[in-house]
Amino acid sequence: MLQPKRTKFRKVHTGRNRGLAKGTEVSFGSFGLKAVGRGRLTARQIEAARRAMTRHIKRQGKIWIRVFPDKPITEKPLEVRQGKGKGNVEYWVAQIQPGKVMYEVDGVPEELAREAFRLAARKLPFKTTFVTKQVM
């Protein structure tokens, strides 16, 4: 699963997930999966979607993952009273804003890419859309 090798700080504030995304264009492949909604994407969800796509397109083409989970999420253990400091880091998330291209694929027909992205989108917690590279 994806997570940073080292970080400056172990724990971060919860913060908010506002604004619009950077990385809104398909830049590496021919087709992309773009977020329509906003939310948190866990490392497990990123990996589950990647596996679904990889299994469908088999060994053809190439897949790019354009998101990285760099925010630690902490949780306190079950049945522990409040206080006594912040909980331990349980998992890592990537914060996703609308318009972010999360996955790209190249070297496969459009129909195959569409179906692979449809399978991947079922693993994600917000709405997505299929996009193609803009040729000028």
From Swiss-Prot:
One of its GO terms (molecular function) is rRNA binding. Keywords: Ribonucleoprotein, Ribosomal protein, RNA-binding, rRNA-binding, tRNA-binding. GO terms for cellular component: cytosolic large ribosomal subunit. One of its GO terms (biological process) is translation. The keyword Lipid metabolism does not apply. The keyword rRNA-binding applies. It comes from the Bacteria. Coiled coil: none annotated. InterPro entries: Ribosomal_uL16 (IPR047873), Ribosomal_uL16_bact-type (IPR000114), Ribosomal_uL16_CS (IPR020798), Ribosomal_uL16_dom (IPR016180), Ribosomal_uL16_sf (IPR036920). NCBIfam families: rplP_bact (TIGR01164). HAMAP family: Ribosomal_uL16. Belongs to the universal ribosomal protein uL16 family. Binds 23S rRNA and is also seen to make contacts with the A and possibly P site tRNAs. Part of the 50S ribosomal subunit. This is Large ribosomal subunit protein uL16. It comes from Vibrio vulnificus (strain YJ016). The gene is rplP.
